[in-house]
């Protein structure tokens, strides 16, 4: 769970909405620091082989099916989600890699 603008956001709820799109093979949502909202969601998406999906289409789908504060602010398309030996998605790794790359710092 992360908190965006004082509201609890459960990644599983957002991920379930994303999996409604047939192009998505894997999806993970993480909360990252945001100066305005405290935290905001970033969607990491791995598409099924041969499929195409644009960020604007994914965001539009989320806007239609989620409360505004639950809609991811950014989408990152990746080949595959990082997993541990038992197959669990390593969201901590996604978060650390994202924050270390270009996410804004909170003062």
Predicted region positions:
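AMP-binding/adenylate-forming catalytic core of the ANL superfamily
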Residues: 1-70, 79-82, 87, 93-96
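Acidic/polar alpha-helix N-cap and adjacent early helical turns
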Residues: 96-107
């Amino acid at each position: 769970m992360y908190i965006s603008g004082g509201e609890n956001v459960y990644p599983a709820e957002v991920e379930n909405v994303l999996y409604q799109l047939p192009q998505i093979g894997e999806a993970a949502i993480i909360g990252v620091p945001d100066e305005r909202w405290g935290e905001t969601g970033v969607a990491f998406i791995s598409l099924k082989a041969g499929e195409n999906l644009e960020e604007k289409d994914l965001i539009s789908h989320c806007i239609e099916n989620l409360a505004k504060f639950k809609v991811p602010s950014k989408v990152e398309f990746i080949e595959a989600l990082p997993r541990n030996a038992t197959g669990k998605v390593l969201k901590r790794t996604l978060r650390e890699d994202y924050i270390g790359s270009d996410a804004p710092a909170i003062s």
